[in-house]
């Protein structure tokens, strides 16, 4: 294990806080639902905390009285408890329904934002990134983010109320027994924190590996005709097997961390029951604790352990969600290479004269010039054919005109106007283009033919 310097640790923690700050604004359109969800979660937790205390009070007062006193008190107590649990049931319905819908709405908003941003990104981004990875971010990552958006704050809030509330009652019942339990909780938190950091790295690797599987699958299925025509099924099978195996290895590391985390927490929970029983029995023997109080202690330990188990599951969910959100941010914070200039104007009243003046170009990941100091003019209304061997730059020349890429030297003019001074939408609307690799969208033949001009 490599120990990170303290400065590096602080840097990583700062990144986590920075990511959470970027995530919080997505709650803004649903803040009313969010706060009502937390209020309902608080009511559910407080009612769970109240029942053992009500039972303890009744055991020491009403149930210690005569049978007539007990019978007289049963009806109002029963009605009060019924009302209490009806309220709890309604709150649970709101949390389960509206809380989940809040997460689903946030998932929809983020998916739309990601899709819209994909459409703005330049060709250079798609040259360097695989569509399978992009699909993984649109589907798998956003589902994990949605689960975190709903369950994260809600479960954390419920757990904190139950943990703090149960410990308050444990101290009220018997302070001596509460102290060793508090020490156990301290060590449990230290253990959980250490394991949590290890799990985060494995979840991020999982996201990457499932993206690799999607990439391999998408490549093979999209090009299945080419694969079969060259009888390359075995080659593609080996490529997919490699990606599939890497995902299994990543999952193995992930499940190892999870197993250590969950088994360790379960062990600490068992120790809490052990301490309660043994030390509680000792206090009863010394006359420092009542038997009824030990029973209440066991109930509150159960209430205390329940949110710890939720927090254990929440840790896994949060790690998946944060890993997915990092990948989401990596895309939406990527700026397109080709954008409108601030003073860009629409292309209007086109005659159609095209000038390439001393145009040079190389791709962003390679300094080798594809075009070098190319100049020519195409008069309006003329038809021109570019003829040359494969790789001579014919497609590149065509791709520069609608600004799929920007020239690295020289300039391109339409009717004397530099195409960089024009808005992208108006420029591309004036250009008809047939790609080398024809792609058919889902829909009718008519819709595909009219794709460039649906009206």
Question: What do the predicted segments below correspond to?
Answer:
Residues 34-91, 171-176, 287-291, 445:
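Transmembrane helix-loop-helix hairpins at lipid-water interfaces of multipass membrane proteins
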Residues 32, 123-124, 140-149, 153, ...:
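An intracellular "coupling" helix at the cytosolic face of ABC transporter transmembrane type-1 domains
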Residues 340-341, 347-455:
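ABC-type nucleotide-binding domain
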Residues 209, 232, 256, 304-331:
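Cytosolic ends of transmembrane helices, especially the final helix of ABC transmembrane type-1 domains
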Residues 19, 27, 95, 99-103, ...:
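Juxtamembrane loop-to-helix connectors within ABC transporter transmembrane domains
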Residues 52, 56, 87, 153-196, ...:
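A hydrophobic transmembrane-helix motif
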């Amino acid at each position: 294990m490599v120990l990170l310097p303290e400065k590096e640790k602080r840097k990583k923690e700062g990144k986590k806080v920075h990511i959470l700050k970027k995530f919080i604004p997505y709650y803004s359109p649903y803040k009313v639902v969010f706060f009502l969800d937390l209020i309902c979660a608080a009511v559910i937790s407080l009612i769970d905390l109240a029942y053992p205390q009500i039972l303890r009070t009744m055991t020491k007062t009403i149930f210690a009285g005569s049978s007539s006193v007990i019978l007289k008190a049963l009806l109002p107590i029963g009605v009060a408890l019924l009302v209490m649990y009806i309220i709890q049931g309604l709150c649970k319905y709101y949390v389960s329904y509206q809380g989940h819908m809040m997460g689903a709405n946030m998932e929809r908003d983020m998916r739309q934002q990601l899709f819209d941003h994909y459409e703005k990104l330049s060709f250079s981004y798609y040259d360097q990134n695989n569509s399978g990875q992009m699909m993984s971010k649109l589907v798998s990552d956003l589902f994990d983010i949605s689960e975190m958006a709903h369950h994260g704050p809600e479960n954390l809030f419920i757990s904190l109320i139950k943990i703090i509330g149960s410990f308050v009652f444990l101290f009220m019942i018997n302070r001596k027994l509460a102290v060793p339990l508090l020490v156990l909780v301290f060590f449990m938190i230290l253990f959980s924190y250490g394991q949590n950091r290890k799990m985060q790295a494995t979840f991020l690797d999982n996201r990457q590996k499932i993206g690799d599987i999607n990439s391999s699958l998408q490549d093979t299925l999209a090009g299945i005709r080419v694969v079969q025509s060259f009888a390359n099924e075995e080659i593609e099978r080996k490529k997919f097997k490699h990606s599939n195996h890497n995902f299994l290895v990543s999952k193995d590391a992930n499940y190892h961390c999870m197993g250590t985390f969950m088994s360790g927490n379960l062990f600490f929970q068992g120790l809490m029951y052990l301490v309660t029983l043994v030390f509680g029995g000792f206090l009863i023997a010394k006359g420092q604790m009542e038997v009824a109080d030990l029973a209440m202690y066991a109930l509150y330990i159960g209430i205390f352990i329940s949110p710890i188990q939720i927090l254990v599951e929440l840790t896994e969910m949060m790690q998946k969600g944060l890993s997915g959100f990092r990948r989401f941010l990596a895309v939406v914070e990527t700026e397109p290479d080709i954008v409108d200039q601030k003073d860009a104007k629409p292309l209007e009243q086109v005659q159609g004269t095209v000038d390439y003046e001393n145009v040079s170009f190389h791709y962003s990941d390679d300094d080798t010039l594809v075009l070098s100091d190319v100049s020519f003019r195409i008069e309006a209304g003329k038809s021109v054919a570019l003829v040359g061997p494969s790789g001579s730059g014919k497609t590149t020349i065509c791709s520069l005109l609608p600004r799929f890429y920007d020239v690295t030297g020289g300039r391109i003019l339409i009717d004397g106007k530099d195409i960089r001074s024009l808005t992208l939408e108006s420029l591309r609307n004036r250009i008809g283009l047939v790609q080398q690799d024809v792609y058919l969208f889902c829909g009718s033949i008519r819709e595909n033919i009219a794709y460039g001009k649906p009206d």
